[in-house]
Amino acid sequence: MALARVVTFEGVGKDRMAEMDREMREGQPPEGVQTTEIVVLHDPEAERSLVILFFETEDDYRRGDEVLSAMPAGDTPGRRTSVTKYDVAARMTT
């Protein structure tokens, strides 16, 4: 069963989000992070962001969580306010 790591951030301005978007497009996930997909949602007026990382296995999730939890604050979109693990119960793309 796939798993999702859902992270909320505050203090994410438009400029920082544009910078993160550029870094994600040009780079690779951090070493040890084996995601199948990353979705980033941004509310520029509230300066909040929600990041959803999808993992195929529990081991991939565990390793990714360890790496991402240890990241320096400057490598994240803003101030991390929560991290929650979810089972991916259903998924559809069109």
Report residues per predicted region.
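Short S/T/G/P-rich N-terminal loop/turn motif that feeds into the first structured element of a domain
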Residues: 1-50, 56-70, 76-94
